[in-house]
Amino acid sequence: MRYAELQVTTHFSFLRGASSAIELFETAKSLGIDAIGVVDRNSLAGIVRALEASRATGVRLVVGCRLDLQDGMSILVYPTDRTAYSRLARLITLGKGRGGKDNCILMLDDIAQYGEGLLGILVPDLADDTCAVQLRKMAEVFGDLAYLSLCLRRRPNDQLRLHELSNMATRFKVKTVVTNDVLFHEPGRRQLQDIVTCIRNNTTIDTVGFERERHADRYLKPPEEMERLFPRYRQALRRTMEIVDRCKFSLEELTYQYPEEAIVPRKTAQESLEHYVWQCVPDRYPQGLPPKTLQIIRHELDLIHKMKYAPYFLTVFSIVRFARAKGILCQGRGSAANSAVCYILGVTSIDPETNNLLFERFVSQERDEPPDIDVDFEHERREEVIQWIYKTYGKEKAALCATVNRYRAKGAIRDVGKALGLPEDLIKALSSGMWSWSQETSDRNVRELNLNPDDRRLTLTLQLAQQLMGAPRHLGQHPGGFVLTHDRLDDLVPIEPSTMEDRQIIEWDKDDVEALKFMKVDVLALGMLTCMSKVFALIREHKGDDLDLAKIRQEDKATYEMICKADTLGTFQIESRAQMAMLPRLKPKTFYDLVVQVAIVRPGPIQGDMVHPYLRRREKKEDVDYPTPELEAVLGKTLGVPLFQESAMRVAMVCAGFTGGEADQLRKSMATFKFTGGVSRFKEKLVSGMVKNGYTPEFAEKTFSRLEGFGSYGFPESHAASFALIAYASNYVKCHFPDVFCAALLNSQPMGFYAPAQIVGDARAHGVEVRPVCVNRSRWDCTLERIGTTQQHAVRLGMRMVKGLVVADVARIVAARMNGPFDSVDDMWRRSGVPAASLVELAHADAFQPSLKLARRDVLWAIKALRDEPLPLFAAAAEREMKTIAEQNEPEVELRQMTKGHNVVEDYGHIGLTLRDHPIAFLRTDLAKRNIVTCEEAMTARDGRWVITAGLVLVRQKPGSAKGVMFITIEDETGPANIVVWPKLFEKRRRIVLGSSMMAIHGRIQREGEVVHLIAQQLFDLTSDLSGLADRDMEFKLPTGRGDEFAHGSPGGGDSRDRSPPKPRDIVVPLCRARHKGIDPEPETMPSAFPKPRDFR
């Protein structure tokens, strides 16, 4: 018997389904099920994944959706044709618009309005009066397309229930159909389904009760089993295929139409595009258009015309033109930088002719895929661009793509552990030991946490967390991928409101959009463009230079000298540990060297074994051999090594006779060969083509294996060139205007690889004076202040650095300051009108010290005398005057001042950095007694020397291409040190590596030229050494212990024999939990003030 399962829920019914579409379709194929009806709840979010699973397995997909109505009815709806699908998409959009994010509010009347062409199956519970009313309504709304589901509930009298439902359906002339209400593909997923139910209901497995499924039968069954379970309802079983035949709609029928763009009156989109291209040519080529470039432009315009992509190019041109008119810095990147048309229109900044790029990497007639132009904008002003797009195209025709937020290791551990009732501290210990979402949950990791790996609930947590990894958690918002349409967008896909105001998103992500060949425009945010925009503004204001990206001096020697020394902290793209390690070896001296530098520290070139051959050839340690002049023409710039995706494509085209489209298909097949194996069909063509053109079989095989090794991660040369432009510009500014660069970078946070503490530390190391936050001099942003009568400038930290302070209060402070500086805390409070809580935040940041010379505790004491409550009119002045007199008559209080160490802790806790001594400086005497050297001593030691050094952990990085190697950067008062932790040591000391704030490392120095690393052999967690830091001054005596007991107090307290007698007038201020209500307590343990290390995965 042929059978289709029409009620299947995938894991895109978030936290309901426990299996993916591909798992369900593969299982259906193995069981002999003809078709699957995917009916995720109130959503079509997973339907494209189901389409791809259907394509892969050959099992027919019936597009559907389960609608849960406000009156309690649940109806499975299936569009029978294309217009019915559009009505379904609009119906879901209507419900999402009413319900907001993650909710859908629909009534039966809505279905009646949009229901033409929809087939409906009522999902009943009992054959009662409610069901009778619902059946009558179903017959009225759906007519001949109305059905009633017969589904086992595995409860007492189940067969009687089915019999009554069948009779009731006959009475209302509604046909019955068998469904199985599938939630997972095989019985083993039952436990995971229970867990996601607990997560959804925010409860535990012990208390979830009847919210969980009452039976384990919610998996796919073969037709024979369904026939055995429903022996009396064979006609209802056969109707499953009847419904499949009636629902002829396929997602393949969706035809996407890009909106018409004809900016020039009375011209078509193609004519408008050509008009603007030739109009912009003199701006890019004032000396005249080179003949080769003219040929490239004509070739591109011809291909754009054939593929009907002119409206897309005009849209991107319009967006970029709007941004430039508003002074918003922007630049195109990605494969679009291969296009001469994009370059001439100002969308990208890379001349394809000069850089010998490849247009087929961007647009190919054989590939027949929509182009993809990524444009980066200043991240603080991108919203202006997004709202312009909505206003220009209309919200009914424009929306952002979704992103699928999936479970990773830590999130899976947390949610599963909570669902299974594990204690919070145990969940935290387990999740903190996870680095990435790979299978890092071995018994060894559990034992390292002193846990019992044989504990059943703990073992089950790890097993179920592994099953949950990769499952979708909810839909998020794409950073800027817009889908624009000619007609209504909700005819193609449901739209829902975003959590962000004035935004809306479709239910599909970029992969879904690409699978259906929709075109999208990527309006992305780049923090470094914000930084560079602020750099240029500060240079114009303080240096008198009118600088921009196009006017920066090219091939500046001083800039490249700085880059070669890996002095690139805070710059773009070449600031990571791996990039810094490569810079002294590659020694970039030209712009193209920088393009190579950006691209070479990537998984692709590393896995393809291309990095070391390139470096050896660059250092003249290995000869470069080109078997033919054609290969030299292709790979000459990269010394015979195909570092870029375009290089691989050119090798295929020039050496093996591939067309441009075939070469791009080769690139795509290499990118997915691990999953599809499609690369094998190109191997024979490439190898035989190269042999036919005179290459040896051995060389051809070697070439293919290299391309295969890096294809899945290869970097486009056009993309690298676009990023190299910004990388060079940021390094140029850092080299020649370090004060400006520091201020702009701080004003653009959060962004980049390093925290403000490291940015400020690096600026000071370059001779930049950095001044603290000041209530009388700081604005919201960091500013530049002239140093005396010189042309030098110091950086004044802005109030944006103060944690907990809002921009509105800062604006009031700055406005009040226009009438003169504040001379006291009370004066500032009266004139600015900011609440006392904001003054407390400024006091914690020590912002009163620079101009008013008031210490933190003195300010906090003064703030306690202020009143936020408004006083009655007329009585206000008199009452305030009396209070002031009383306060003036109050005896002066001498507060015990904070230690230097406590001030450092407070600095880190409230502004994220300190301009005082480094925290490790307070521990140096103790560390020296343990033979722990400074980071500077370690990094200047000879090669092979064994040392032990310690510092605060700044950055942890574990690149996917590094084969499990962990790179750590630590810092002490002398500077940073670079640590390499091999996989064996990482697994052995995982808790220390991932959990410590301060670490000591014993290891051996490794030098390769100017690149220095400390190869770790032993690791020690010194975080506890920081706990008493707040009690210390630079000169202090370590507490002396007496055996196993403490001397009259808490750990970390001083030796009572060294204490001086108390002064008679010392006032001890009571400790208060709420910071804004009292003075800082004397810390017995250090608060978690230091910024957490930045982890890069």
UniProtKB/Swiss-Prot annotation:
Q: What does this protein do?
A: DNA polymerase involved in damage-induced mutagenesis and translesion synthesis (TLS). It is not the major replicative DNA polymerase.
Q: Which gene encodes it?
A: dnaE2
Q: Note whether Acetylation occurs among the keywords.
A: no
- List, in alphabetical order, the Gene Ontology terms for molecular function in this entry: 3'-5' exonuclease activity; DNA-directed DNA polymerase activity; nucleic acid binding
Q: Which UniProt keywords apply?
A: Cytoplasm, DNA damage, DNA repair, DNA replication, DNA-directed DNA polymerase, Nucleotidyltransferase, Transferase
Name of this protein: Error-prone DNA polymerase
Catalytic EC class: transferase
The text of the family note is: Belongs to the DNA polymerase type-C family. DnaE2 subfamily.
| Stretches the record annotates as Disordered | 1039-1097
Instruction: Report any one BP term from Gene Ontology.
Output: DNA replication
Q: Which InterPro entries match?
A: DNA_pol3_alpha_NTPase_dom, DNA_pol3_finger, DnaE2, DnaE2/DnaE/PolC, DNAPol_HHH, NA-bd_OB_tRNA, PHP_dom, Pol/His_phosphatase_N
Q: Where in the cell is it found?
A: Cytoplasm
